[in-house]
Amino acid sequence: MLANLTFQTLMSPATFQIGDISVESIKINPKTEALGYQISYRGYTLVYATDTPSEHADAELFSSFLKLADKADLLIYDGTYSDLTYLHHHAAAETVQPWEIGIDIAKKANVKNLVLVHHSPVQTDTALDQLQEKVQSRFASAQIAYEGMTL
């Protein structure tokens, strides 16, 4: 590799500065060691979280995550594998999907905007368009991420 790269191990919780940018990280999934990040700059706050626990799986971590996301301008959330991916599985229609949990979190944390990322590669453009309609019908300022999207 021609570049000189430096890696820093993050502990949880952690707060640090990168110039004028404030970063806070917390553990959001003990099984995967996943961290959630709150990034603040000039009065704007972005929260990035993937692989999050459900409220029922770990109430304490879920509560910490809600505090991290509280009143964020933007929550980027893992909406992996919607029910549209699993239409051939009857049980999928009866289970709560990750995008629904993301909307629930956005509402509980009073998040202004929600972007769902990490879609299944088997989803067609039509399926993603249908998902976008579902998502916006539940949270008007929510959208699914797409290639080339600018935030």
Which residues does each PLM region occupy?
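Binuclear metal-dependent hydrolase catalytic cores
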Residues: M1-V47, P53-D58, L66, D125-L151
